[in-house]
Every structure is written in structure tokens, then in C-alpha cells.
Amino acid sequence: MTERAQTAPGRRTLLGAAVLGTAALGLPGTAEAAGRGAPDARGGGHGSYRDLPVPTVIGHRGASGYRPEHTLGSYQLALDMGAHIVEQDLVPTKDGHLVCRHENDITGTTDVAEHPEFASRRTTKKVDGVSLTGWFTEDFTLAELKTLRAKERIPGNRQENTLYDGRWEIPTFEEVLRWADKEGRRRGRPVWLYVETKHPSYFGGLGLGLEEPLAKLLRRHGRHRADSALILQSFEPTSMQRLSKLVATPRVVLLSGPKERPWDFVESGDPRTVADLVEPAGLKWIASFAQGIGPTLDLVIPRDGAGRLTTPTALVSDAHARGLVLHPYTMRNENTFLPADFRRGTDPNAYGDVFGALRVYFEAGIDGIFSDNPDTALIAAADFAKS
């Protein structure tokens, strides 16, 4: 029996709460007692994103290390474990609803292939220059998507998670907002959300732009202000620029490999790459419309040819010098995803020395981390805070 099977989610939750305390869990603290006022449990008036605990632990697609990603079950577990923020990725349906999926291709994360009534919807598309064959959210109405059920995306790595296949449907973002509002009222504090617009240029070209309907939902739920308990993010900087004109919610630009170009840059002919954006001039430009960056971990500490960590880059200090927070992605507990110097044993799906890896990244000065296993990251953050 593995350690994961021996430790129940409830035990993880209690341990995280006991170790971190109310401040790290985002509970009301001395600032409010001094007169800032009680936060709005719907997600507004909570104070700045800069008041979040550092390192901030972001539940990546919920607690996707333990449940099928982007389900209410995954979000609930991340929150119960004590994650400071819970992440959602947004894609549209054919009839314009925003739903929570990491990609518009739902072949690997739902049971759509088992629905004969949708067999003819299988098609090949080019999304951001990549040819994909499968089933896509923009070809389904919301009512049709609601007949599907979510499943584990990487069952080869996380066989235990397949136990929960078929348990949850695809949530709309509005359903998630209602869930967060309800949980906020129950807990007496806002539930922070981290919301990504996926492939905004692609969807804009289909007449399914993401920014306007997203802004409308944020205003409806009181999460459109600078002090709202929500952060927006995108790999396309122009999506954040558009949203900056619609809502005051904090914004983060996501950054992938150094040689890659954001797809909106490709379409507009902007020659800059991610390598250009992480230079001081690029960071200064990002700081003109965003409050942070979400770089891949390799932009913070590169790996060598053997997959081992090398020397940290200047990205943390350069970003901080321009007032930007850094929330890199993604930490996962399994050996196969860890730097080679923190893998343990020969089983790629066994857990490695995650605590050791997280300490190195925290020592580099990052402000937070996206993690599939928020309970692990919370304990690592508490260990780091005590050191």
C-alpha cells in the first residue's frame, strides 16, 4: 500500500490547517482587526493579492494530483486541503457558455468517445498552429456537454484517480463562482480563484471571444475590482490587455519556453519570443498592464541535459524590480515530473523528494507555486517559513 492510500484527504486537510494556521490559510487576521473591515465572502473587498501568504500555494486545476482535473470534486479537495487559491481554465461552448477545461479538446478528459450520439463530432482542427483530432467544446452546446462526465487525464501516471472517473460533470465557470460564493459564506472568508483564458485568439476568430463574457460574470459576482479575491491569467498578453479595460481584477501573463512566441504575437506578426519577454524591457512592458508573471519553472531554474537543476536565472530579481509577482508552474509529486536530482527510486510514478525540490524553488525567491498536490506544497511552504 502506498503512502497516498494510507493518508486520507481529511487527515491531509487537518495537517495542513494545523501546520499553517489562520494566516497562511487566508483567514481574517490583524489587518482586518485594525480596521480594514470584514471581507466580502462573495470574493470582493478581500484586500490586495499581495496580502496572500508567500509562498502562495495555488491548487493547479484544483487538487488534480488526487481527482480528475477541473471538476468540483477537485476544486473542493484543493480548498479543503488549504490551498490559498484554486485555478480554473476557461473555454467556450458552441452557445457561448464558459466551461472549465484545460483544453477545448475534451477527448482525454471526458467520456465523450463513449457517446455514440457524438461520434460524428470527432474532427481534426488546427489550434494555435497545432493539428489536433478529437472532440472540441466549441462544437457542443452546454446542454450536450452536461451529458458527459469527467475522467482522469493521465491515468498512466495516476491510476488511483481513475476511481473517480464518471463522478463529476464539466462545470461552467458560473457554477464555480456560485460554489466559491457558497464556500466563502460558509467559511466566513473569500475563496480565491485563479482564472485562465485559453486560446483567446483562436476563439475570438470563431466569434466566441472569452474576455467579454468573462468580465460580465466577474461583475455579476462582484469579482471585478482590484481587491477582488481573483487573479486573471493567460499565455496571450493581449487577452490580459483587453481584460484590463473591462475589469480591475489583477492580471498575470503566463510564460512558456524561451523560444516560443505567444500565439497572439504569431498572429499579429510581433517577433518577440518568451526569451524577449523575460528580459528587463519585456518585463517592463508586461508591468504596464499586468501585476505578475507565471513562468514555467525552467525559466526560474533551468535544467541541464540530464534534467538536473542548474543555477537560477535573474528572472526573480528582474521581475521583482518591476513590481511583478512570480507564480511559476507546475509542481507535481511524481518522479517523472520532477528534476532528476529529486527523483527517488526507479518507478516514474512514485513520489520523489518534492519537499527538497520545492525548497530550492522557494529559496530562489518565487512568490507562489502552482501544484497538483496542494497539501504537499502547503507543508513545504510552512517548512520554508520556519527556516
Could you tell me what each predicted segment is?
Residues 2-387:
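Phosphate-group recognition and catalysis centered on beta-loop-alpha active-site segments
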